[in-house]
Every structure is written in structure tokens, then in C-alpha cells.
Amino acid sequence: MSKDYDYRSIEAAAQADWEGAQVYQVAENAVDAQGKKKSKYYACSMLPYPSGKLHMGHVRNYTINDVMARQLRMQGYNVLMPMGWDAFGMPAENAAIQNKVPPAKWTYDNIAYMKKQMAAMGLAIDWSREVATCNPDYYRWNQWLFLKMLEKGIAYRKTQVVNWDPIDQTVLANEQVIDGRGWRSGALVEKREIPGYYFNITAYAEPLLSGLDGLGWPERVKTMQQNWIGKSRGVRFAFKHEIADDYGNFIQDGLLYVFTTRADTIMGVTFCAVAAEHPLATKAAANNSALAAFIEKCKTGSVIEADLATQEKEGMFTGLYVTHPLTYEPVPVWVGNYVLMSYGDGAVMGVPAHDERDFAFALKYELPIKQVIALKDESPMFNATCWEDWYAQKDGVVCFNSAQFDGLSHEEAVSAVAKALEKLGIGDIKTSFRLRDWGISRQRYWGTPIPIIHCGDESNPGCGAVPVPEADLPVVLPEDCVPDGSGNPLNKRADFLSVKCPKCGKPARRETDTMDTFVDSSWYFMRYTGPNAKTMVDERNEYWMPMDQYIGGIEHAILHLLYARFWTKIMRDLNLITFDEPFQNLLTQGMVLNETYYSEDASGKKTWLNPLDVELDLDEKGRPKGAKLIGDTLNTPVVVGGVEKMSKSKNNGVDPQALIDEYGADTARLFVMFAAPPEQQLEWSGAGVDGASRFLRRVWMYFSGQASALRDASDSLPSNLNDAEKELRREVHTILKQANFDYQRRQYNTVVSAAMKMLNILEPIKLDQNAAISAPVLRECLSILLRVLYPVVPHLTHVLWKEVGYAKTMGPLLDAPWPTVDEATLVQTEITLMLQINGKLRGDIKVPADANKEQVEALALQSEPAQKALNGGAPKKVIVVPGRLVNIVA
């Protein structure tokens, strides 16, 4: 056995063994050697977008999953660790436009390369279950379930105001609008009314909220979903009016509805604000060119609540009035740029005295501000020129200047106002949710075609929107399209567009919108269980699901996880599955960070520099005091920008392939597991990578030196162990017990620490004729080290396991039994305590493990250092710290 740690040949040999035996392909209902059914464990990382190359975030995510899967397999679980590709979406189209190739080719080429990278990492993936969401065999089931949802009324078509990117010619999700601009094009986003398909996720708001309670998810993620769903209880009521349309009918039956959680402030209403698209706004703008222009301005910008909360509040009076339901006073109606038609009724009541947004609006437009709640102690006083936080308080306040509601607390007033409005027939208590229905239509090519055929046109309605018959699924996306950036290329494909109406047989036109890619990622984890199933899912899904452990970034806390939970409940209601939640446990790994460096030109424009191209100038304490570009003869000033998330934009990423080529996959895996606990941020360190590599070389060299003696050693321990052997086993099994605990709580950084401690203990031991430790004892201890280290460092440990001969007696390492802690060996009959004289360490003493304070004192006083210090006299005091030390004050 070579003493050189040749990671290339070691990793190639291990991977050849695994691939040749197809060791990662798992089957349902697997049994152990005794024929007993194994418990299943489904551990899955969020599937990646095939962007072309893995980044270090991928490496960390998949290594966490792999460590978990390997360790649980050794514990006897039937473990599923699959992988797939979230293959549809805009990046492929953008790359296709840039490279003038079909998105399909770009995507499949990237998948092939990234699979090679994953293989190089040594991941225990069952590739027989691979799924690519751009494959018609996969997305046909998106289409099939869409049709089922259409039948049940869960999917529906409507026209709604959306974010429209005029450059990319597509609808943008709220999350794709940044500071009012399209995330990719940078164009000012417009508000447009566009017909599209929606999923009625709001009908599931309550179960989506209550279902969080039983999940083993981080509280932070649960809170984010709770806030996104946004349950609130309040009063929905109407302001009456007599504003008629062109036909003489009262608009919306003469009722302007609003929803409020602060019905106790109803007597302070001094205006109402409506969305730019509200029927009252449209009515008022018909004869008001200034208002019409303002409404058009409102249609540019985001439809996101968060953006609206921070943008400048603007409004314009419509000239219309509605009637206050309790005071019967006229209330002016304004158009506000902060009111969304898609939220609630598209109108809000304005109470400037007790809502900070309304307060600012009223000051700007000189609207009345009427105080209607006051602190119980009436101090401090209300000031209509300056906002104070207590104005919006619910606790410790009472109604004031509110007629029959004066003196009532918040809760009392809400109840009383609700009853008064209910008695008038224009209001009631209502539960409202912030959650909006999920719009899935995208004016994009590279996505799942929506299975709808349009029959007729404006002059001849025909059959309208007709679902594609199930027998005609999938509606296959032509994969040879090359987008040019001028909108959806499907609109130019007659071979895709032209079709006969399934109802009447007349010429018709396919829907060219495709589904939001979140549809693809909402159920892929179920398709892994039966990728070749003739139905959407089959009985294998019931075996593996719900998933035991899901792993992914915190950035997916809301949309992906929420949509996946919704999709699961839909499938349950359609009797496709029996479970209610998809992911029992969730681990959100921290981001990978690295140093950033940049240079600036005369205009202040930054050019971000890769850390590998920068040389640091360190002070005497090793702290950076400056930096320069390597090989730069122009002395370009380099600014140290601090530690930030690895990203293309900051040019501070580390190429995993380059890392594996230079150090090997085991070193990369060891570093990302050791550098930080999984949930915490990981700061990249070249020195840390070097340290991981040195540790693995130490492991290899130590085993290579003992291999020949260990191969012939017995697996049975001697019946009579000497003191050194007992102590060695106690130390190793103590560390094993801690490692087991750390594996259980997913603290893999301290698992690596445990392996390092074991090596430090074992490394000094050499098997020779004078060795105090016998070969069988060392063989047992080293087998524990290899098994503890194996999930993190599978290649090196796999080869050593074979070289030392463990495979002959215990089988391949990946299925070797997880080591059991020998509790008996942990029991100590004797312990060592530090001995101090007058607070200074003077040696140690051995005492019985169960010795009481008096016995410890006696043994300490009998020791040679104590006898010498006391010189026949008595001590002033003896201090015993149980289990640690004895201090004799002479």
C-alpha cells in the first residue's frame, strides 16, 4: 500500500467500485440480512437549475444531503437520495438569444456537464430516478393535473392587473420586480390587464397556515410563510353612493366596499382611496383628463405590496363622494397609487389620525385629520402635525370623539362597530388573507404549454377556451425554436398554433402561454419515487412520501415551499395521494461567503476582481492592510470590499471543479462540512482547504503504516485488556458517543472534529513487538474512525476499508454496520484530578471514580507534592472541585 495520498487514483477507484455495482439504486420495501423490512428514509436536496456549472452553494447543499444519506444507510435505513433538473425558465431563453441555439440544446448540454461534476463529488445519487422538468414525460402530468384543476374550478381564467416587462414582453412575478424594474431587462415595469390562468390557492389559505404547526421546519421559515399567507380578522363594510354608470345603474350596486382590521377607528375616516383600475376611478376619469393621465401613470410600476409601502404616496381627487355608513357625512374618493385592485376590493378607508400611511397622505394633500382614539391616561396629547407611534396602538387606548363608541377598548369597539354595520346590512366580521391566487400564465416559450385550445375570435366567439382532451396529452413543446427576444416564438409557429377545436372540429388556435416554472418544481420530488410510472404517481409514492428531510436555501422559504405544499393538498383532494404535507423536516443551509475586491475608474464604476487574482499586503499581526492585483504593473488601486455571498456579480466565486482537480472531492467535502454548522453561513478559506487536505494525508499515511499488521489482526477483542487498551477504548467510544449525537442533530462540523480527535489519539500508536496496544484493539478503534469519517469523506475511507481488510469481514463500507458505543467501557473506576498547591498546578492524582470529598482530600494530602509543601504541617484549606481538581492552601 503506497504511503502517498494520491487522491486522483483513490477517488477514481472508489467511484469505479460504486458505479460498477450500481450501489445507489434503491428499491421499495427493502429488507436487511435477516429478512426484516428496513425503515425508509427519503432525503432530498432542492433540484438545481441546469445553469452550466455547479457553484459552491450546490456543493455544500449536496454534501449535506450525501453525508446524511450515507450515515443513515449504515444505520440500516432504506435511503433514497435522487436528483433532477428544474430545466424550464427564462435563463435558458436568454442564453439561447445570446448564443443563437435552441434552449433545449443549451439545457441538455448543461445537464450532461453538471452530472459529471456531481459524479466527481462522489454523491450517492440514485440516477435511475433522474427527472428533467423539460421532458414531455414529466410535464404531461403538469398539463394533466391542470385539466383536473380546471374541472374542479381550482384553475380558472381571468383578466387581472399584472407586472408587464415591455422589453422581455412577459408577465413578471412580484419577486422579479426590483425597484420598479424588470430583474433581467431593467425596464420600467408597467401594470397591464392581461388574461391568464390562475390557481385558487387562496381557497387553501387556512390549511396552508394550520399545516405549518406540525412540521419540523425552522421557526424562521414558518414565520415567513405565516406572514406571506397573512391571516387577519376584521370587518368588511360598504360606503353607500349613488354614482351611476353610462346606463344609469349604480356602480357596484351603489356600494364601495373596504376591509379593515381597525374598525374601532371608523369614526375617523376622512377620505377613501381606490385603485387606478377601480370602476369609480374609471367613471371619474371619463371627463377629467388630468385624472386620466394620473391613472395612466399609476399603471407604470410594481404591483407588489412591499414596493408600494416604500414608494412615495401619490393621489388625486376624483370629485366623487361616498356616504359614511354611521355618520352619514360625505367622504371624498381619491385615486391612490398605493392601492391595488387585486387586493381585497381595490379600495381602502383613510383614517389619517391612526394610520401612518394615511397620515402622510393627508398632510401632503391637506385632508382632515380626526382623532378618534386616545391613550387611557390621556397623555401625551395628539398632535395632527407630527406622527407618533402611539396613534396606531391597539393596547392601552380607548375610543374618543366616536359618539356611541366612546370609552370602548379596541376589541370592544371592533365588535360594537361590526354589529352596528351588520344591523344596517352593509358589513360583517370577515377573515382576510394577504395571500393572492397564483397566476401561472407566462408569455414565454421555454415552459410547460398550457393545454388549452382557443376556438373563435372577437367576431365569432366559437367554443371559446377548450381544454385539450386527456388522450392528446402531452401538448409537446417544439424543441427547435431559437428565441430572438421579440416575444414568444410559439406565436410564429404555425405547426404548433394551428389545430382543430376538440368540440366543433373547426380551425382553432393553441394557447401559447406556458406555465410558471414553479409548477414544475411543485411536485418533482414525488415523480422521483416512480419516474417511469404510467400515471402521475403510483404506489411507490406512498412508500417514500412524505419526504423525511428536505434540504435547500432560505431563499425558497416562501414561494417554492408554499406552492409545493399547495400542490400536495390538491393531489390529496383528487385522491392521488393520502398524505397532507410533502416535507416533514426542512434544513436550510447557510450561504457560502468569500472576500470581495474591486477597483474603481474615474467615474466611480466598480470592477469586481476575483480573489485568486488579488494579493494581500498583511501587517505584523497578519491582518490585511492593503491589496494589489497579481502581475499588475500599473499599480491599480484595489479596494477590499468585505465578505459577501459568492456570486457572479461580485466575481468572488470558487469553481468547484478547479477545487476538486487541485485537492480532490474528499478535501472539498471535508472543508465545507467542517468550516461551519450546516444552517450557518460558511466563510471560504484557502487555509481551511489546505488544512482539510493535510488531515486526509495524515489519515492515509497512518493507515498505510499499519496496514500490513492490521490485515491479519482478529476482529475479536482479547478477553483480558490491559490498562492502556481499556483507556484507549474508553477514549474512542466516548468520542463515538459524541459523534453519534452530532450526526443525529446534523452538526457535521463537530462530527469532523470528533474524527480529528480520534486520529490524534490513535496516531501515536504503532503496532510492533513492544506495543502496549494489541492489533485487535487498534483494528476496532480504526474501524470506528473510518466509519465515523466515511459519510463526509467516502472515497478515502472506502479504499482504506478494503486495503486494511475490513471489507472481508464486515462487507463494503457503505453498508457496514454503524459502530455501537460500548457503554461498559465508558464507565471509569478511576479518574485523574489536577493537583494544585496554593493555586498553582503541581501535578495530578488518581482517585476512585466514586470517591467522596473526604476521600479525595485524604488522597491529595498523601501525595508527594502536598507532603513537600506542608512539611509535616496541616493545610489551611482544601478545595475540591468534583471531577476536575484539588487545591491545597498550605
Curated annotation (Swiss-Prot):
Q: Which residues cross the membrane?
A: none
Gene Ontology annotations of biological process type:
leucyl-tRNA aminoacylation
Q: Which UniProt keywords apply?
A: Aminoacyl-tRNA synthetase, ATP-binding, Cytoplasm, Ligase, Nucleotide-binding, Protein biosynthesis
**Which compartments does it reside in?**
Cytoplasm
* Residues reported in the UniProt entry to bind ATP: 648
* Domain of life, source organism: Bacteria
GO terms assigned for molecular function: aminoacyl-tRNA deacylase activity; ATP binding; leucine-tRNA ligase activity
Motif 'HIGH' region: positions: 48-58
Q: Which family does it belong to?
A: Belongs to the class-I aminoacyl-tRNA synthetase family.
| HAMAP family to which the protein is assigned, alphabetical | Leu_tRNA_synth_B
Under what name is this protein listed?
Answer: Leucine--tRNA ligase
